[in-house]
C-alpha cells in the first residue's frame, strides 16, 4: 500500500509543477466514464457500483469547474496522472476501497486548490523526537470530513471514520485516532503517539 502513498505524493507535486511536459494530458481525463463500454477492470468496477459512479460524476463536475476557473497544463497533467493512479487500483488487494479513496482524494485536492475554500488552521502536535513533526488541517466542510496530515515531509489525505470515542481518520495503510489529548498514528506500520498540547 505504500506505493499508493508515493503515487499520491507524486500526483500532488505534479499538480504544482511549473512546466509539465506538453504531451502528458488526455482530452478525456476529466470526463465521466462511458459506462456503455468500460475499457478496464477499474472502469467496470466504477460503472457497476452506484457510490463509485456518483463519485465519478462529482469528480467530472469538480474538474470541469476547476478548468473553467484556472485552466493550466499543470492541472490537466495532474488529472491525467490521477487517472493512471485510479486505474492502478486494479492491482491493489482491495480495488474498490483503493478506487473510492482515489476519487475522494482527488476531489479534496481540487477543493483545496479552489481559492473559495476556507483554509483551516494548521495544528502542530508534540511527537517523540525520532518520529518527527506532525501537523494537521481539518476540513470539516467536506463530504466526507477530511484531514490533511503532514509527517516528515509527506502529505496524506485521510477521511473521517466511525469511532466510539474520539476523532478517527484513515485510509488504506494510515490511521489517525485522537482521544483525550493523545493522537495515535499508524503510517504504513510505523506507529507512534503524539500529544495535542
Swiss-Prot record:
Inducing factors: Constitutively expressed, increases in stationary phase (at protein level). mRNA levels rise nearly 50-fold during mouse macrophage infection. Part of the glbN-lprI operon.
Renumbered to this chain, the positions carrying a covalent lipid of the kind S-diacylglycerol cysteine are 16
Show the Pfam families listed in the entry.
LprI, MliC
Disulphide bonds annotated for this chain are none
Q: What is its main location?
A: membrane
Impact of changing residue 24 to A on the protein? Answer: Decreased apparent weight in M.smegmatis, a portion of the protein is protected from extracellular trypsin
Extract the signal peptide range: 1-15
Result, substituting residue 117 to A: Decreased apparent weight in M.smegmatis, a portion of the protein is protected from extracellular trypsin
Keywords for this entry?
A: Cell membrane, Cell wall, Glycoprotein, Lipoprotein, Membrane, Palmitate, Secreted, Signal
Modifications after synthesis and translation: Glycosylated; alpha-D-mannosidase treatment decreases its apparent molecular weight. Glycosylation probably helps target protein to the cell surface; mutation of predicted glycosylation sites (Thr-24, Thr-28 and/or Thr-117) makes protein partially inaccesible to externally added trypsin. May also be glycosylated on other residues. Glycosylation is probably not necessary for inhibition of lysozyme.
Query: What Gene Ontology cellular-component terms does the record carry?
Result: cell surface; extracellular region; plasma membrane
Top-level division of the source organism's lineage = Bacteria
Membrane topology according to the record = Lipid-anchor
Covalent lipid sites (N-palmitoyl cysteine): 16
Q: What does this protein do?
A: Strongly binds and inhibits lysozyme, may help bacteria survive in lysozyme-producing host cells. When overexpressed in M.tuberculosis or M.smegmatis increases resistance to hen egg white lysozyme. M.smegmatis overexpressing LprI survive better during intracellular infection of peritoneal and monocyte-derived macrophages, both of which produce lysozyme during infection; M.smegmatis does not encode this protein. Somewhat better survival is seen in human cell lines when M.smegmatis cells express both proteins from this operon, i.e. GlbN (HbN) and LprI.
Q: How does it assemble?
A: Homodimer.
- Per the similarity annotation, which family is this? In the C-terminal section; belongs to the MliC family.
The record's annotation in PANTHER family points to: LIPOPROTEIN LPRI (PTHR37549:SF1)
The name on file for this protein is: Lipoprotein LprI
Q: Which organism is it from?
A: Mycobacterium tuberculosis (strain ATCC 25618 / H37Rv)
Q: What is the lineage of its organism?
A: Bacteria, Bacillati, Actinomycetota, Actinomycetes, Mycobacteriales
Gene transcribed to yield this protein: lprI
